[in-house]
Amino acid sequence: MNACVLSVLCLLGALAVLVEGVTVQDGDLSFPLESVKKLKGLREVQEPRLVSHKKFAPRLLQPVAPQLCSSHSALPEALRPVCEKPNAEEILQRLEAIAQDPNTCEICAYAACTGC
């Protein structure tokens, strides 16, 4: 009887983890991985400038936080609390790194990802 109850509890726990999905945590903030993935499409990719016929010079990247927080209505609601933080730029850069390769987060290669 106890084994049956334990089995049911384990299955319910596993189901709860699967339903909740992967969570990305940065400090005291946590976000669903699906919201973090949306960052990838929000930021326009800067095209490199042609310096000579063989070399490209990268442009200086514009700060991410002011652009996303003030003018981008497509910023997922779950990520909006980042805009209120004084280090929003650093947080968004870390989240963008995860957004560039979310598969790595889905297998929990990042320490910031939980719920695998």
UniProtKB/Swiss-Prot annotation:
Question: Which keywords fit this entry according to its UniProt record?
Answer: Disulfide bond, Secreted, Signal
Q: List the disulfide bonds.
A: C69-C83, C105-C113, C108-C116
Reported tissue expression: Localized in both crypts and villi in the small intestine and to superficial epithelial cells in the colon.
Lineage top rank: taxon: Eukaryota
Q: Which GO terms describe its molecular function?
A: guanylate cyclase activator activity
SUPFAM superfamilies registered for this protein in UniProt: Proguanylin
Name the chain's protein: Guanylin
Record's InterPro entries? Guanylin, Guanylin_sf
Note the Gene3D superfamilies from the entry.
Guanylin
| Annotated signal peptide | 1-23
Q: Which organism is it from?
A: Mus musculus (Mouse)
Q: Which GO terms describe its cellular component?
A: extracellular region
- What are the coiled-coil residue ranges? none
Q: What does this protein do?
A: Endogenous activator of intestinal guanylate cyclase. It stimulates this enzyme through the same receptor binding region as the heat-stable enterotoxins.
Is Disulfide bond among the key words of this record? yes
| Family affiliation | Belongs to the guanylin family.
